[in-house]
Amino acid sequence: MAVKIRLRREGRKKTPMYRIVVADSKAPRDGRFIEILGQYQPRGGENAIALKADRVNHWLNVGALPTDTVRSLLRRAGILKARHEARLAAKLQAAAVALPSGEA
C-alpha cells in the first residue's frame, strides 16, 4: 500500500479550504484517508498553513511520500528544512565518530 501526504478539498464553492491528509494513493481525492495532519487555506493570509509537525515527521519517517503541492507547503512551513538539518547533523556526527576510530 503506497501512502501519500496530499490535499483533500473542502469548503464552499469558489472558496476552497484544503485538509492535509495521509491517504492511500489509490483512494479518491476526497475519499478515505488515514489521518488529518493539518489544513491549508489559500486565501488565508499569513496563518494559511496549520500543521501537526510531529505527525508529519512521523509519516515521512515511515515512508509516506508528499505530493508536489504538499512538499512546497511543507517547505514554506519550515518542516522540510528542519528535517534536512536534523538528518545532516546525524550524518555528520556519525562520520565524526567513525573517522577517529579508522585513523587509530
Curated annotation (Swiss-Prot):
Q: Does the keyword Ribonucleoprotein apply?
A: yes
Which cysteine pairs are covalently linked by disulfides here?
Answer: none
| Signal peptide positions (record) | none
Please name the GO terms that the record assigns under molecular function: structural constituent of ribosome
Say which domain of life the source belongs to.
Answer: Bacteria
GO BP of this protein: translation
The UniProt keywords, alphabetically, are: Ribonucleoprotein, Ribosomal protein
Checking Gene3D superfamilies in the record gives: 3.30.1320.10
Give Gene Ontology CC terms. cytoplasm; small ribosomal subunit
Entry keyword Ribosomal protein:
yes
HAMAP family assigned: Ribosomal_bS16 (MF_00385)
| UniProt family annotation | Belongs to the bacterial ribosomal protein bS16 family.
Question: Which NCBIfam families would you find in this protein's record?
Answer: S16
Which protein, by its recorded name, is this? Small ribosomal subunit protein bS16
Which gene carries the instructions for this protein? Answer: rpsP
